[in-house]
């Protein structure tokens, strides 16, 4: 059993980053809504608790409150932004609407304390240690609770961080979880290892053996059915479950006709031939295209593709004798987004295709071996299981596939043109060493024609857009500044090698305001 940090979520857009940063220090943690029950917290038995930021103000009537048990367990507590303000307000301090709001970079001067011990960005002209941090707050603590002292300040925020070192209670008004706070990771590392006394016991080699043991204990001699998509999550889940129970795993691979070039062949070679996994291949491309006829709305396309997949998968799963379990590649961000922790006020932010749905219709028990892992941990696990590097580190691909990379109605002709254009784009990125420098790259088919000149003749053909972004967390993204020579080479190849496309454009929109996918 791992020692664990509990993170209580008060609604900050950065909360997930806290969990990722803690995991990066080789410490296990879980993220749960702020209103979990005292019994849940007691049974979780955390060695430390982190209170996240959030959009609320502590002095409003319906302000979220920290469960009182947090301050009674006798474990270290770190409040971040709103978490610090809530801690201050509930322990006898005061919070006010700040006259000077801080959004962005700020410099803080720090005082000696365990949390900041040995951590600084520089020594200022007065000989005091300074930190460059990222602020995002409109309220501030204006009176410290009894027993607390100020451990960081600037002109706008006299109590930018506070500490009661007797109880190991700390609060920081800034966000140590974001990369903009240069020493943020070191501060969180100090908190979990030096203050909470956490060990370094969260790593993938150990996790593989633990996960295999858990799968065997749960499944016994039953068969497990898994919908294999070829994406990183389902692929790693399949490899892990197969390592645990061998031929008891049966994978169903539904080729919906909306995959990338040669993707179906690669998936079958990797799993059926190389890993000896039992894979049932269903060629359903025509069926999906028939159902998509005349549909132009992106959400309706998603629903149609999802519904068709469920029907086909269910038909095949029902043929498998002694199948008692449905395995899914659900990962921790899916669980967080769907408010997967069962708490009294946990609202669903959005439904996710991997959380819920199929088990009820199939009357199967659910097996989610990656449920507690972040994406980077899933990739690390995939390598530990021997999956090919190219598969483990391939860019994200949407569940509906090319169906949402073709604007408007999906037609067979469009899928063929897009497949070829996308393959050229990715091949050239790999050849130029840019594939792993980008977080996601793909082509988009625009169902409009433009005039061109091919030799001495006028052409009137389709347009393809290229999209490549760089991001750490996919919450925000910057368009990749690919070299002009590379873009020129890609454009020339697409236009010269693919009959039907005579214009290529490059998308230079960031997220926000644009999303990464076009639909």
UniProtKB/Swiss-Prot annotation:
Q: Which GO terms describe its molecular function?
A: ATP binding; GMP synthase activity
Binding, ATP: 229-235
Please tell me whether the keyword Transcription regulation is annotated for this protein: no
Pathway involvement? Purine metabolism; GMP biosynthesis; GMP from XMP (L-Gln route): step 1/1
Report the Pfam families cross-referenced here: GATase, GMP_synt_C, NAD_synthase
- In its keyword annotation, does this UniProt entry include DNA-binding? no
Q: Per its UniProt record, what SUPFAM superfamilies does this chain match?
A: Adenine nucleotide alpha hydrolases-like, Class I glutamine amidotransferase-like, GMP synthetase C-terminal dimerisation domain
According to the lineage, what is the superkingdom?
Bacteria
Query: What Gene3D superfamilies does the annotation carry?
Result: 3.30.300.10, 3.40.50.880, HUPs (3.40.50.620)
Question: Which stretches make up the Glutamine amidotransferase type-1 domain?
Answer: 4-201
Query: Top-level EC class, please?
Result: ligase
- Residue numbers annotated as active site: 81, 175, 177
Reactions listed under catalytic activity:
XMP + L-glutamine + ATP + H2O = GMP + L-glutamate + AMP + diphosphate + 2 H(+)
Q: What is its EC number?
A: 6.3.5.2
Partners and quaternary state? Homodimer.
Q: What does this protein do?
A: Catalyzes the synthesis of GMP from XMP.
HAMAP family in the cross-refs = GMP_synthase
This chain belongs to the protein called: GMP synthase [glutamine-hydrolyzing]
Organism equals: Nitrosomonas europaea (strain ATCC 19718 / CIP 103999 / KCTC 2705 / NBRC 14298)
Lineage runs: Bacteria, Pseudomonadati, Pseudomonadota, Betaproteobacteria, Nitrosomonadales
């Amino acid at each position: 059993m791992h020692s664990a940090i509990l993170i209580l979520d008060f609604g900050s857009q950065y909360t997930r980053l806290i969990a990722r940063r803690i995991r990066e220090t080789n410490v296990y943690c879980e993220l749960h809504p702020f209103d979990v029950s005292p019994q849940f917290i007691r049974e979780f038995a955390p060695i430390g608790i982190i209170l996240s930021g959030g959009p609320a103000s502590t002095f409003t009537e319906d302000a979220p409150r920290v469960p009182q048990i947090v301050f009674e367990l006798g474990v270290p507590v770190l409040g971040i932004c709103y978490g610090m303000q809530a801690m201050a307000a509930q322990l006898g301090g005061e919070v006010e609407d700040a006259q000077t709001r801080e959004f962005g970079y700020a410099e803080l001067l720090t005082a000696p304390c365990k949390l900041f011990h040995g951590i600084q960005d520089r020594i200022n002209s007065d000989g005091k240690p300074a930190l460059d941090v990222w602020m995002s707050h409109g309220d501030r603590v204006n009176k410290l609770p009894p027993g607390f002292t100020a451990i960081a300040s600037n002109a706008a925020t006299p109590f930018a961080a506070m500490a009661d070192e007797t109880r190991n209670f700390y609060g920081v008004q800034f966000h140590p979880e974001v990369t903009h706070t240069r020493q943020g990771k070191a501060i969180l590392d100090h908190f979990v290892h030096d203050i909470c006394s956490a060990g370094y016991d969260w790593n993938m080699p150990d996790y593989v053996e633990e996960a295999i043991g858990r799968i065997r204990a749960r499944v016994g001699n039953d068969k497990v059915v898994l919908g294999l998509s070829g994406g990183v999550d389902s692929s790693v889940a399949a490899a892990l479950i197969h390592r645990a129970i061998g031929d008891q795993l049966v994978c169903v691979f539904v080729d919906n006709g909306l995959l990338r070039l040669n993707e179906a062949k690669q998936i079958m070679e990797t799993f059926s031939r190389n890993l000896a996994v039992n894979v049932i291949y269903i060629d359903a491309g025509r069926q999906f295209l028939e159902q998509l006829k005349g549909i132009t709305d992106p959400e309706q396309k998603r629903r149609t593709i999802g519904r068709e997949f469920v029907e086909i998968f269910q038909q095949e799963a029902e043929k498998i004798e002694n199948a008692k379990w449905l395995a899914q590649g659900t990962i921790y961000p899916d669980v967080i987004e769907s408010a997967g922790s069962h708490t009294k006020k946990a609202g669903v932010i959005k439904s996710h295709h991997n959380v819920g749905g199929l088990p009820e219709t199939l009357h199967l028990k659910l097996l989610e071996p990656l449920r507690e892992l972040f994406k980077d941990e899933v990739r690390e696990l995939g390598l530990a299981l021997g999956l090919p590097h190219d598969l483990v580190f391939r860019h994200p691909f949407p569940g509906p596939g090319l169906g949402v990379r073709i604007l408007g109605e999906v037609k067979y002709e469009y899928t063929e043109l897009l497949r070829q254009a996308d393959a050229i784009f990715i091949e050239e990125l790999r050849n130029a060493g840019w594939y792993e420098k980008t977080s996601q790259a793909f082509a988009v088919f625009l169902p409009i024609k433009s005039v061109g000149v091919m030799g001495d003749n006028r052409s009137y053909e389709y347009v393809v857009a290229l999209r490549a972004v760089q991001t750490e967390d996919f919450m925000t993204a910057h368009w990749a500044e690919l070299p002009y020579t590379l873009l020129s080479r890609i454009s020339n190849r697409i236009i010269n090698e693919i009959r039907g496309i005579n214009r290529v454009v490059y998308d230079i929109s960031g997220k926000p305001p644009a999303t990464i996918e076009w639909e």
